[in-house]
């Protein structure tokens, strides 16, 4: 299996670590953070910095809401949504580990620990391998993601809706890691980078432009007339003029 948790050592180990030596103990309380986005890291800032952080309550509330949608306490899978809570949290742990932000690793490891892992069938192992490899690559070297890699996710059983959710949660945890790293920096502490990981790609300014760019989906598009009621409601909320302009 790609993911392994060593209960005998009361700790966590994930296949993206370079070795099992020196892995950190699992803190079960890390899953119980009242603020599952900042994980209590803001409480250790001096009062002036803490007040500046909390002036951005709109952004923080939106981030917490995203967390709750992507990582609920319970989740039922269906024919069109096969990405289980185990899949989501194990992928989040992969992204947290390649980010090297220890509180984030502890949190997702603690949430993952009580869950039952998938069966050990060949198909399940292949699926977990593809999910883990894609999560790691998108989090560290996103420019290497190709259309065939997206097709491979579909080949191992992820629906288009699964793939969208999957890439969203990878992006969210990467964003969360950066916020926590900034908080650590404000406290004068560098994020603890685990050994054996490649450095994430830097962002190039030339990648941003105000010019009108052409865009095409790499996933099958959903026609408005065949969309579910929930999808139509979301479309009306975020783009009220989309139907009339299409």
Give residue ranges: language-model regions.
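Hydrophobic alpha-helical segments
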Residues: 1-246
